Amino acid sequence: MAVNQNFCTFLLFILLPAIHGDFENSVLDEHNRYRAKHNTPKLTLNADLSSGCASYAKEIAAKNSLDHSIGNYGENLCVRSSNPVECVKMWYDEMKDYDFKKPKFSSATGHFTQMLWRSSKEMGVGKAKSSGGLIYVVARYKPAGNVVGKFKENVLPLGGTKPECSYLIMLLWVILFLFK
């Protein structure tokens, strides 16, 4: 019996991080898939951010609330009855309400703009299940996005030109014009 219990404990310590990591990596991959559509650099996972996300997800799941925390990061929250990775699609779907011609913050598109925020380099993610079976998801981003006055250069349209490339394109046009 002791051998089986020790073996089960060993398996738990080996498999639990892998299962948890799969969720984190799936959310990261979804973010980066959407960011690529907007020529926005990939995010990387930050273990400290993820740890804080997991703790906060437990807190809001216990309260059944979606109250934002306060910190030096951007934050997206979501609650689902099933597949928590679908939160990323839900946040991205806010794009339909975002006006790229008048880039600014809106509470209707804040999740979308944060997940695509070009200057954000790292993210963390965590989840927790409430007593009612709902799954609460917390994603945090560093540096924080949704900075007033910085939307145009940080939230690019689909297939958007990278800001550093736009200068090269402009330079090529000038050269072509001068040497015509």
Language model segments and positions:
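A solvent-exposed, acidic/Ser-Thr-rich amphipathic alpha-helical stretch
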Residues: 66-80, 84-88
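Conserved, non-catalytic sequence blocks in retroelement Pol enzymes and Pol-derived host proteins
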Residues: 18-22, 80, 107
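Disulfide-stabilized extracellular recognition modules
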Residues: 81-180
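Short, well-ordered surface patches within globular domains
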Residues: 19-73
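Cleavable N-terminal signal peptides of Sec/SRP-targeted secreted and luminal proteins
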Residues: 4-20, 168-179
